[in-house]
């Protein structure tokens, strides 16, 4: 399944919830009304896009002719840009789900994170890549981690000593990030366990 846009995810979630609550899918008019579209035609365009992405089937000739091709999302969630102060896996950060077997990675991956920037390029982690992440706080010095400093999320190599943490880039053009644990909020969100080159798995 290709990643859904935020708006497509809203439409998909609405359909799934409506079926769960009423036993039948919503009409185009109901979708338009609930999501603030100007007309049922706008809802129809989103339905066609979802059909092209393989998450639902449009049954012609019926006002409620929508059939979900998967009852619930499976695969690994892809986390895009993370808003300040919010959980990494908050629903609004999830761009879609990818059919990737978590057990391909050791330890197994719990989610994918879209990489932003080139600070880790020397070990093959490029801008736009999908980083497979095992959700854990049990990490060791020298491992590549997903860390949150105050409200910023970053991918770096960990070096911790006492109350000081250094987050080391793998690109000579970048300088390490130094964190004083007595003054700054610092959380390990997970351990990097693999990379999917941008576009290869889509």
From Swiss-Prot:
Instruction: Tell whether Transcription regulation is among the UniProt keywords.
Output: yes
Q: Which Pfam families match?
A: LexA_DNA_bind, Peptidase_S24
InterPro entries, A to Z: LexA, LexA-like, LexA/Signal_pep-like_sf, LexA_DNA-bd_dom, LexA_repressor, Peptidase_S24_LexA, Peptidase_S24_S26A/B/C, WH-like_DNA-bd_sf
Arranged from A to Z, the UniProt key words for this protein are:
Autocatalytic cleavage, DNA damage, DNA repair, DNA replication, DNA-binding, Hydrolase, Repressor, SOS response, Transcription, Transcription regulation
In which domain of life is the source organism classified? Bacteria
Assembly and partners are described as: Homodimer.
Task: Output this protein's name.
Answer: LexA repressor
């Amino acid at each position: 399944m290709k990643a859904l846009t935020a708006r497509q995810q809203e439409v998909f979630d609405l359909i799934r919830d409506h079926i769960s609550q009423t036993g039948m899918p919503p009409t185009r008019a109901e979708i338009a009304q609930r999501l603030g579209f100007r007309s049922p035609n706008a809802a129809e365009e989103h339905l066609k896009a979802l059909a092209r992405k393989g998450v639902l089937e449009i049954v012609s000739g019926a006002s409620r002719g929508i059939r979900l091709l998967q009852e619930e999302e499976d695969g690994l969630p892809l986390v895009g840009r993370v808003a300040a102060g919010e959980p990494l896996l908050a629903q609004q950060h999830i761009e879609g789900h990818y059919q990737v077997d978590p057990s391909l990675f050791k330890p197994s991956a719990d989610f994918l994170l879209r990489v932003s920037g080139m600070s880790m390029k020397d070990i093959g982690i490029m801008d736009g890549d999908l980083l497979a992440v095992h959700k854990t706080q049990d990490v060791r010095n020298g491992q590549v981690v997903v860390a949150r400093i105050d409200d910023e999320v970053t991918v770096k190599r960990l070096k911790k000593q006492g109350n000081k943490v250094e987050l080391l880039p793998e690109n000579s053009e970048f300088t390490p990030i130094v964190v004083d644990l007595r003054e700054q909020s610092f959380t390990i969100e997970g351990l990097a366990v693999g990379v999917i080159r941008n576009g290869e798995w889509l």
